[in-house]
Amino acid sequence: MKRIAFLLCVISIALSCYAQNQTLDDYVSSVKEKSCAPIDYIFNLFENSDIVVIGERDHRDTTQYELILDLLKDPRFAQEVGYVYTEVGCVNRTKDVNKLLCGRYKSDKAFNDALYTYLRNEDFNPLWDKYNRVQFLRGLYEINRNSKHKITLGLTDCNFSWKRIKTAEEYKNFDDSPACAYRDSTMCLHFSKMYAKQKLKNGKRKALVITNHPHALNATFEGSDYHRQGKWLKERYGNDNVKIVMLNWTEYTNS
């Protein structure tokens, strides 16, 4: 009986691996057929569209930000686009983060001290422990430091300040507010206000939006007609003028 159970387990694993290999083969074939580097692919989208949305993988993933920083590091981004927006970060901290990213510091330690001081108040979560935020901001600072063309970062999440929160009840009231309950439209509203004020580059406004996969979808939320961020942007700025790029997704809870 134990042998039979073992054999069934081996067969199940083999079939699972075969299915995964089939899926992987499809991806490899597609990449070979397209024959275009990921960064060039995104810049090609910007040729005919003004807004490109990147559907971020799980917030804990760091490898995706290697790609994103390589994209921002490309001279074409600062010269032709110049603006990047993120889901993470309260909108009222936008001025502070750009001061951080364009500042001059005597040493790396001085920058890191300023970075961690800023991060303590960037978000409405008591602790945002995702290292890729440090990775992203530090990388963007290095890009700006080494280029005369600066990249501007826009933060799109709910307006929030820890200085205004004195009790648990006050925090709960914020967490239950419409702005938090309908974050997708909140983030879109904040984006649209900042986007309208962007300086023109080559006669146009271009923007890269980085938001988590569920928000980036061109769809409504299940069981409702409430738009996700991607769908809102497409309806606001035109289907062809907004392109959505989804990074491959992993269900961490099942791995």
Where are these regions (language model features)?
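Structured catalytic-domain cores with a bias toward divalent-metal coordination
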Residues: Y18-S255
